Each structure stands twice: as structure tokens, then as C-alpha cells.
Amino acid sequence: MRILKLTLLIAAMIMANLSQIAFADTKTEAFVKENADKVLALLDDDTIDASTRTEHFIGYMDEFTNIDRVAAFVIGKYSRRFSAEELATYRAAFRKYNLTAYELQFEEYRGSAIEITGSTDRSATDSIVDSVVRRQNGDSQDVRWRVLQRDGKYEVVDIALNFDGSLLWLAIEQRAQFLYLLDRTNGSADALINKLKELTDDLRED
């Protein structure tokens, strides 16, 4: 009888955990779907001008992502070595660069629709959401979203794109490039800030 009770208790605990995981997946998937739909709808809205679209886009991205968290991640140990002034200037430059890059990237998906295909919980507060972005011409792009939950709020901290079967996580790729530059320049915040400004200008000229 004791063994039976123990077995039932373990089974109940497993079922409870499974139901919590499924619930977390559903909420995280809905968060990605809802916000991606907002951005795609914004891109397709021909009733607003470019400056208004950019303003709305920035607002959506602030709801969708935590750019300051990503900014700290991509410079690793140097986030603790920069002075407060250097860190603030770097964050501003990183924010401007990332928002410009994301806006141009999303522009390529005008007329597209997103389909959520599943998700995986890495922990109770860390999930990967799988999706497919389908374009009007019939092409599709696999996109993965890493979503963290903090104090009941969801935020995207990285996006992965599938290029010819290889998965590229954008923040991880940025981290490798930024750390390479910082290591070569003895941790110069100015070198990284100037590089970000240069990259932003290049994006706007294209």
C-alpha cells in the first residue's frame, strides 16, 4: 500500500509539472504571436508615413524585447568594466543600431504571416518558441525566439534564423564580434561605440 501511495504521489507530481510546462508554453507562444503580428501589421499599414511607422515600431520593440539586457549580454565581462558614463553611451549607441537593424530586417517581411510551430521550456522562466514566417511569394523562414519571464513580464532576448540548415542566434553572434573587438582594443568602450555608430550609418545609407 505504501508503494502504491508513493507511486500515485510521484505520478501526480509529474502530471502537475507537465501541466505547468504546457501552460507556460501556451502563454509564451501567445506572447510571441501577438507581438510579431503587431509588427507585421504595422509594416503593412500604408495609411501612415515612414516617421510614424518608425515611432510605432520602436514602441512595439520596447514592449517585445529588453534591449538593455541584450546590450549587457553581448559585451560580457566588459559591462562591469565600463564606467557608468561609458555604459550609458554604449547602451544608447547599441539601442540605435539594433532598432535600425531590426526595422530594416522586418521591412523584408512585409506582407508575411507568422505561424507558431511549437516551443520548449529551458526552465520555468526561459523558453524557446519556434515559428515559421511565410512570405507572399511562397518562401518561408524558420525563426526561433528566446523568451525570458521576469516578474510576470515576457521579453525576447535573442532571435535565431535558419540559414541553409545552420541556426544563427543573433545576440550570440553579436557577442562574439563585440568581444573580439573589445579584446583587441584593450576593452575600449570608445572603439565599440564608434563601431556601432559606423554600422548604424551604413545601414541607413543602404
Question: Predicted segments — roles?
Answer:
Residues 94, 120, 132-135, 145-147, ...:
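A mature extracytoplasmic/lumenal domain signature
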Residues 13-21:
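C-terminal segment of classical bacterial N-terminal signal peptides
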Residues 99-141, 195-206:
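Surface-exposed, charged secondary-structure patches
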Residues 26-106:
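Early exported N-terminus immediately downstream of N-terminal targeting peptides
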Residues 1-8:
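Bacterial N-terminal signal peptides that target proteins for export
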Residues 140-176:
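Short beta-strand edge/turn micro-motifs at domain boundaries
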